[in-house]
């Protein structure tokens, strides 16, 4: 699980269409107009905008969970709003008046918007904010099928451009990969040259083919990372998945000039490596194998050993399970200094962390054959998994002097003991200095230290007691941005940009010099920044960031000067839309992603401060535009409800041809984890769309207290008592819907996956059948003592400090659960994230209290995403069919049933024989 980190990441919610849609366009197909360029790119990463992997919490939401330059429905502020209907000519005087009014309106709007962002507002909207209906198939349009949704037919195609820093400071270089090409598998292109070849260098082909031979071995590239000087490519082959983000494989060095390869470690070419990364100077690669670190310099075939005592319980340079899952959201705990002279890395000791056994009954993920006579026993994988209150891994930050070949540590006076410390971010500055972010185990005290590896000294320069500030917590993020000194551009000292708490919101701040604890505030007001900053233009002194706009379901892009002045939108903020963005290394160009509510599109643009005008379409999703003309989808109504004085965002999905005179069943869908967000303007055709569009039920989603972008007061109130306020918000909202004239209050259900599964059960428990009659919980937490320590203690503190909170948050009131008509519980047996222990212990409580109004489905060998052996299709088929039966009244609440004799028929006979 995780709070919103790097954005509200979809992967924290229930998985629906896990795989990205891979596609390859002609790499040379460009069609330019006078003002725009059409660009088709096959790039290294491809993202499915609807992909939803599975985890509790949102690591931001970069989730994430992507047409023309402008959609046909989209317009600029200058467009046709003041052109008279019928195309009549406007008289000159009228034009002057209209232009004057235009400038007054635009100026007034701009002033009002800046005041809004910087001063905020205290009165949230409580009425219907907007209604979206993206399909145009009409009353007789086709209905979507669940197979179409699960098969990805409604998933927007999206590209993730790999921006690449030029060896000589060039901006706007992109890394492209074409798996089908026999002459340009991997290459670097100057995106400006797509529009004006004379203004660009030619493309550089790094690898002609995807495969190459080394001796007798044929190497197939799975991933590839060019060196910063573009002379060598680090190639991964034989990739094998470990956990969510980690993997192992064989690594190779591929020479661009000769188009030949060699093993990264010539002395052990077949041994699997966990992680490898380039020196910023392109002259060395550091890697971890068998939890020890090594260094290969390109000038030699020799491999230097950095550490020697790594093993089962001791990790160097890579995170263990809980740090990978809950802190870094990645597979690396290694950081190169920008000059390549030093390497920082984590030493993780998990010898005290208890093991959790994961059994595999129908598969052997290890790939190893069982011993003779043990073929019929399940394979068991022991995972070091620290549950709440259990011993945590002990982490230390160490450094390696590349020139001296020496490992050392720097003592920094810390208020955190070894077993009470989390290291959540390491950021190199200049001149041998590194910023290190630490928190206590319960993640409510933040400490930032500066370490000088040249003098081997360090000190704490900033401390924040977040618990004392607002009762909240610190999310582990890695979005802090170093800003080097540049007197020519007005920056006398080094500094960094960080997200801070300011007036109850997450805002951007600039700290300079590095040891200055008092920042320059870059943003203020009602709206909150998201995973900021997104990009920094050092030459022009600009910071780009994403903000949840006038409404929490929006995302817009802005820039601001380093001194906090000249706030400017990069997107059209007059439209209620959802954008995200990635910037080139110099922030002169941006991949702008429009993600909804209309059909998503992508384009590369020049940023406003860049004088070189450029615009190129990357993706239009024409296939979705065509489909939408043939289908009838649900309409989405966005609004707010007020519960206990808190304004909460709600999205209601109404069936096609909605008739307010009818009575509709209602399904509530939720996730609800701390910092997460489910109500958004992103385009999505998912399971909820199927329920509303095809089954004809209303689907309601409310982001209750604890979720993201509704202010820290509403977010932090849940701390220490997960489930209580969140369930109340679901119930109170459901009561409001039950009172609506078009809702059948006798047919109301709720469902969720992961944290949403926990919330489903907690809501049913708290409601006791008074509002909801049915529920469906997939892979739920049922007792927070069973979940991992870093996530759980961030929001619940330790069980030793909050036993009462853990007791009340656990699903334990079986009498209340028995008061519902029926509920469904599903879980994968090999779930390494939310262990099946959660569901099994709940079943034991139900057995002890003779509760039987539920159904159970267990998926052998499936992890938290539930995919193994057709399980993903099965889980959604079961959800849909079970819901239909529930709303059809098939699930009867009958305890100790008796035979219905009226159903017996007397046997008919003929000649004494039964017929």
Swiss-Prot record:
It catalyses: Release of an N-terminal dipeptide, Xaa-Yaa-|-Zaa-, from a polypeptide, preferentially when Yaa is Pro, provided Zaa is neither Pro nor hydroxyproline. Residues 1-95 are cytoplasmic. Its main location: membrane. Pfam families: DPPIV_N (PF00930), Peptidase_S9 (PF00326). Glycans are attached at residues 133, 179, 349, 572, 813, 900. It is found in: Vacuole membrane. The chain crosses the membrane at residues 96-116. GO terms for cellular component: plasma membrane; vacuolar membrane. Residues 117-915 are vacuolar. Its EC number is 3.4.14.5. InterPro entries: AB_hydrolase_fold (IPR029058), Peptidase_S9_cat (IPR001375), Peptidase_S9B_N (IPR002469), Serine_Prot_S9B/DPPIV (IPR050278). The active site is at 754 (charge relay system), 831 (charge relay system), 864 (charge relay system). Keywords: Aminopeptidase, Glycoprotein, Hydrolase, Membrane, Protease, Serine protease, Signal-anchor, Transmembrane, Transmembrane helix, Vacuole. It is a single-pass type II membrane protein. One of its GO terms (biological process) is proteolysis. PANTHER family: DIPEPTIDYL PEPTIDASE 10, ISOFORM B (PTHR11731:SF200), PROTEASE FAMILY S9B,C DIPEPTIDYL-PEPTIDASE IV-RELATED (PTHR11731). Type IV dipeptidyl-peptidase which removes N-terminal dipeptides sequentially from polypeptides having unsubstituted N-termini provided that the penultimate residue is proline. Belongs to the peptidase S9B family. This is Probable dipeptidyl-aminopeptidase B. It comes from Blastomyces gilchristii (strain SLH14081).
């Amino acid at each position: 699980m995780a709070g919103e980190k790097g954005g509200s990441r979809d992967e924290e919610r229930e998985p629906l269409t896990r795989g990205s849609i891979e596609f390859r366009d002609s790499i040379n197909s460009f069609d330019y107009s006078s003002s725009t360029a059409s660009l088709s790119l096959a790039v290294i990463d491809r993202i499915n905008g609807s992909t939803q992997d599975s985890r509790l919490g949102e690591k931001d939401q970069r989730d994430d969970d992507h047409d023309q330059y402008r959609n046909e429905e989209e317009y600029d502020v200058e467009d046709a709003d003041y052109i008279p209907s019928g195309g009549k000519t406007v008289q000159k005087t009228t034009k002057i008046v209209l232009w004057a009014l235009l400038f007054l309106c635009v100026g007034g709007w701009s002033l009002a918007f800046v005041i809004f962002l910087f001063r905020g507002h205290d009165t949230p909207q409580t009425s219907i904010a907007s209604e979206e209906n993206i399909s145009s198939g009409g009353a007789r349009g086709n209905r979507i099928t669940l197979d179409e949704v699960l098969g990805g037919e409604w998933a927007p195609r999206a590209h993730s451009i790999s921006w690449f820093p030029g060896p000589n400071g060039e901006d706007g270089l992109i890394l492209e990969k074409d798996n089908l090409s026999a002459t340009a598998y991997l290459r670097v292109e100057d995106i400006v040259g797509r529009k004006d070849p004379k203004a660009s260098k030619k493309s550089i082909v790094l690898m002609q083919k995807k495969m190459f031979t080394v001796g007798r071995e044929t190497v197939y590239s799975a991933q590839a990372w060019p060196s910063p000087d573009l002379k060598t490519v680090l190639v991964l082959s034989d990739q094998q998945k470990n956990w969510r983000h980690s993997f192992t494989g064989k690594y190779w060095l591929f020479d661009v000039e000769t188009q030949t390869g060699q093993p990264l470690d010539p002395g052990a070419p077949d041994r699997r490596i966990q992680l490898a990364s380039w020196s910023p100077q392109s002259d060395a690669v550091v890697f971890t194998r068998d939890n020890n670190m090594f260094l290969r310099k390109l000038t030699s075939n020799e491999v230097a050993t950095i550490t020697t005592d790594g093993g089962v319980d001791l990790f160097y340079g890579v995170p263990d399970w809980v740090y990978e899952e809950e802190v870094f959201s990645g597979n690396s705990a290694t950081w190169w200094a920008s000059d390549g002279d030093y390497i920082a890395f984590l030493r993780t000791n998990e010898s005290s962390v208890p093991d959790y056994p994961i059994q595999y009954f129908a598969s052997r993920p290890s790939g190893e054959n069982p011993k003779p006579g043990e073929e019929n026993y399940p394979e068991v994988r022991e995972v070091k998994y620290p549950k709440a209150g259990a011993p945590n891994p002990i982490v230390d930050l160490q450094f390696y002097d590349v020139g001296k070949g020496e490992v050392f540590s720097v003592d920094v006076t810390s208020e955190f003991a070894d077993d009470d410390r989390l290291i959540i971010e390491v950021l190199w500055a200049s001149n041998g200095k590194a910023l290190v972010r630490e928190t206590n185990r319960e993640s409510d005290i933040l400490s930032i230290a500066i370490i000088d590896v040249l003098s081997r000294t360090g000190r704490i320069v900033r401390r924040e007691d977040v618990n004392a500030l607002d009762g909240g917590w610190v999310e582990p993020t890695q979005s802090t941005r170093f800003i080097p000194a540049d007197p020519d551009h007005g920056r006398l000292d080094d500094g960094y940009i960080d997200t801070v708490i300011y007036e109850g919101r997450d805002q951007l701040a600039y700290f300079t010099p590095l040891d200055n604890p008092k920042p320059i505030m870059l943003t203020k007001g009602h709206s909150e920044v998201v995973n900021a900053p997104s990009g920094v233009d050092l030459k022009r002194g600009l910071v780009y960031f994403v903000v949840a706009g006038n409404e929490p379901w929006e995302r817009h892009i802005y820039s601001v000067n380093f001194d906090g002045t000249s706030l400017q939108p990069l997107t059209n903020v007059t439209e209620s839309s959802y954008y995200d963005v990635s910037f080139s290394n110099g922030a002169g160009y941006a991949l702008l992603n429009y993600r909804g509510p209309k059909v998503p599109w992508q384009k590369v643009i020049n940023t406003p401060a860049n004088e070189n005008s450029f615009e190129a379409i990357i993706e239009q999703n024409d296939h979705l535009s065509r489909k939408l003309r043939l289908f009838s989808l649900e309409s989405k109504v966005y609004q707010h409800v007020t519960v206990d004085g808190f304004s909460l965002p709600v999205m209601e999905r109404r069936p096609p041809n909605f008739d307010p005179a009818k009575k509709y069943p209602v399904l509530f869908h939720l996730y609800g984890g701390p910092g997460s967000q489910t109500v958004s303007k992103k385009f999505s055709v998912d399971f909820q769309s199927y329920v509303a569009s095809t089954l004809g039920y209303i689907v309601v989603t409310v982001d209750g207290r604890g979720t993201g972008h509704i202010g820290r007061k509403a977010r932090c109130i849940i701390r220490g008592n997960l489930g209580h306020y969140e369930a109340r918000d679901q119930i109170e909202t459901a009561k409001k819907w039950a009172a609506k004239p078009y809702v059948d209050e006798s047919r109301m259900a709720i469902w969720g996956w992961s944290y949403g599964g926990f919330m489903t059960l907690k809501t049913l428990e708290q409601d006791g059948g008074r509002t909801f009659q049915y529920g469906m919980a997939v892979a739920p937490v049922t007792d927070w003592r069973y979940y991992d320590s870093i996530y759980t203690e961030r929001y619940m503190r330790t069980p030793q400090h909050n036993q009462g909170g853990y007791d009340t948050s656990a699903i334990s009131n079986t009498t209340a659960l028995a008061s519902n008509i029926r509920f469904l519980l599903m879980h994968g047996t090999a779930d390494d994230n939310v262990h099946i222990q959660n569901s099994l212990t709940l079943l034991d409580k139900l057995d002890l209290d003779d509760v039987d109004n539920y159904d159970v489905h267990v998926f052998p060998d499936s992890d938290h995403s539930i995919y193994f052996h057709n399980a993903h299709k099965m889980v959604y088929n079961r959800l849909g069919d079970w819901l239909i039966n529930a709303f059809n009244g098939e699930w009867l609440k009958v305890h100790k049933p008796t035979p219905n004799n009226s159903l017996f028929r007397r046997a008919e006979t003929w000649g004494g024989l039964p017929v």
